[in-house]
Amino acid sequence: MDYPGNLFVVAAPSGAGKSSLVKALMELDSAIQPAVSHTTRPPRGQEKHGREYFFLSPEEFDSMVQRDAFLEWAHVHGHRYGTSRQAIEERIAHGKDVILEIDFQGAINIKRIFSNAVLIFILPPSWEELRSRLQRRGEDSPEVIELRLKNAATEMAQAREFDFVIINELFERAVFDLKTIVHAQRLKFSAQRRARAETFRALQIP
């Protein structure tokens, strides 16, 4: 189905800076709305229920799975993550632009359902920098960091499945790149015809 709104799906290996980039984009672009995922993992730091994630018990997550409430869900780093079907469909059906942070498995699954979804993959500039960022975050044991790096190799091998790739070396440049992708999507013929329907009619453009 062709929805009037845009769905931007951002994925990255842990530590690449995905969440920081999406947060910065939304501070610059009030027209784009976040799609908050559900997860069984515990909150980190200052994360709040309903802002970064909806934090669920395994039983609550199971209930949503049984109700087919998720557009997709997957196991990631020992926890489960899911995307609400209703929340996404309602927003883009009403012409809203939605951005979703998700793992690479979920991104590819969503593309199968929403063929017009724009998939964006965030890469670190090097393995050394990725390791350094995970260590500076101070949230994981050395064993968990090694597991995340191992998973990152698998995830980054899937980058070819995405529409756009951003290398997050200089943060300000990466934010600019992300904003540029969003803006370019809004300038596509189909998007402009919907957004400026009166102008298109006046110019007799079918």
UniProtKB/Swiss-Prot annotation:
Record family assignment: Belongs to the guanylate kinase family.
SUPFAM superfamilies in the record: P-loop containing nucleoside triphosphate hydrolases
Compartments, as annotated in UniProt: Cytoplasm
Record GO terms (molecular function): ATP binding; guanylate kinase activity
CDD domains linked to this entry: GMPK
Keyword ATP-binding included in the entry's annotation: yes
Catalytic activity: GMP + ATP = GDP + ADP
Sites where the protein binds ATP: 12-19
Protein name in UniProt: Guanylate kinase
PANTHER family listed in its UniProt record: GUANYLATE KINASE (PTHR23117:SF13), GUANYLATE KINASE-RELATED (PTHR23117)
Xref: Pfam families: Guanylate_kin
Catalytic class of the enzyme: transferase
Keyword Nuclease: no
Record-listed E.C. numbers: 2.7.4.8
InterPro entries per record: GK/Ca_channel_bsu, Guanylate_kin-like_dom, Guanylate_kinase, Guanylate_kinase_CS, P-loop_NTPase
Function per UniProt: Essential for recycling GMP and indirectly, cGMP.
SMART domains the record matches: GuKc
GO cellular component, one term: cytosol
Coiled coil regions, renumbered to chain: none
Lineage: Bacteria, Pseudomonadati, Pseudomonadota, Betaproteobacteria, Burkholderiales
Main localization category: cytoplasm
Keyword line: ATP-binding, Cytoplasm, Kinase, Nucleotide-binding, Transferase
